[in-house]
């Protein structure tokens, strides 16, 4: 096993919308990398069951994307709730890094953090208070080096595990092309 307090935890959530007061988590996935962005382990990815009333209340964008990806059907058929997904995710992460050591890594992670705080508070507490948000580098590249930003094409599937893989690859790209750092 590759336990180290330098490991990075990457997380992505799919939700029924953007408002944690009204919307809920419908998918969670995690990946653990070392500090060089080498993938050490892919955590369990869970479609999280939510009541039909909540799913039918989704806006058109979420309904369309989560139907096209197959996530909506997986959510309806899932028996996993938020507490079970949180517990199993924590059990996986504890094998790779101590609590409070890894920043929350991914794209637009402040949004994920809002939902974790409300619906998965134990998992939220497991992360360091800092974030490693790849979106920051994307925004900087768009403003300071638009040719570098334009050369990186990212096609989100809006499936949590693939979105994490894409975020890791995006950070590798910016490390090499924007920051001019090799592995």
From Swiss-Prot:
Record key words, sorted: Cytoplasm, Exonuclease, Hydrolase, Nuclease
Coiled-coil boundaries: none
Primary localisation category: cytoplasm
Domain of life: Bacteria
All copies of domain Exonuclease, residue ranges: 8-171
GO molecular function annotations of the record: 3'-5'-RNA exonuclease activity; nucleic acid binding
Uppermost EC category: hydrolase
Record-annotated active site: 129
Entry-linked SMART domains: EXOIII
Protein's job: 3'-to-5' exoribonuclease specific for small oligoribonucleotides.
Name of protein: Oligoribonuclease
Provenance organism: Coxiella burnetii (strain RSA 493 / Nine Mile phase I)
Gene for this chain: orn
